[in-house]
């Protein structure tokens, strides 16, 4: 049984989840869903590690959504895991990131299971939305 805090957090993050879903991202909320996706998917995938922090709200989520709308070349798949909320799913996805340290929010572009581009939280916090969008568009152009 969950406590009041956990229920409050589940309700609070609904709009944060929906922002990426409305942009075409598939939520992976369990370890099994991550494994199923990663083991049965080919091509390129943009993974957004979502978060409740301000830089996720003001920069990461809107930048990811705009980049996939604006880019000429786009990843084959768009998925998201939610750090701090879907802990098992996030931990499982991070296993596929190899030696890259945990960072949330963050964005990873994968070819198959290989990370070919990664944007850490500190790169999101210190950037404008346009800089993040350009960063993603360039990664898409090179890898998709």
Swiss-Prot record:
What InterPro entries has UniProt attached to this entry?
Answer: BrxB/BrxA
Quote any Pfam family the record assigns: Disulph_isomer
| GO terms (BP aspect) | cell redox homeostasis
Q: Please state which protein family the record places this protein in.
A: Belongs to the bacilliredoxin family.
* PANTHER family given in the database record: BACILLIREDOXIN BRXA, UPF0403 PROTEIN YQIW-RELATED
Protein name from the UniProt record = Bacilliredoxin BC_2157
Species: Bacillus cereus (strain ATCC 14579 / DSM 31 / CCUG 7414 / JCM 2152 / NBRC 15305 / NCIMB 9373 / NCTC 2599 / NRRL B-3711)
Q: What is the lineage of its organism?
A: Bacteria, Bacillati, Bacillota, Bacilli, Bacillales
């Amino acid at each position: 049984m969950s406590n009041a805090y956990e229920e409050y957090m589940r309700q609070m993050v609904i709009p944060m989840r929906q922002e990426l879903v409305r942009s075409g991202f598939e939520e992976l909320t369990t370890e099994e869903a991550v494994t199923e996706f990663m083991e049965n998917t080919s091509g390129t995938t943009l993974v957004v590690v979502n978060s409740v922090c301000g830089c996720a709200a003001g920069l990461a989520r809107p930048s990811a959504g705009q980049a996939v709308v604006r880019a000429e070349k786009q990843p084959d798949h768009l998925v998201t895991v939610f750090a701090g909320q879907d802990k098992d799913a996030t931990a499982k996805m991070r296993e596929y990131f190899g030696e890259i340290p945990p960072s949330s929010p963050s964005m990873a572009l994968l070819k198959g299971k290989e990370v070919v581009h990664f944007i850490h939280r500190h790169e999101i916090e210190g950037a404008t939305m346009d800089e993040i969008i350009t960063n993603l568009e360039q990664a898409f152009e090179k890898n998709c």
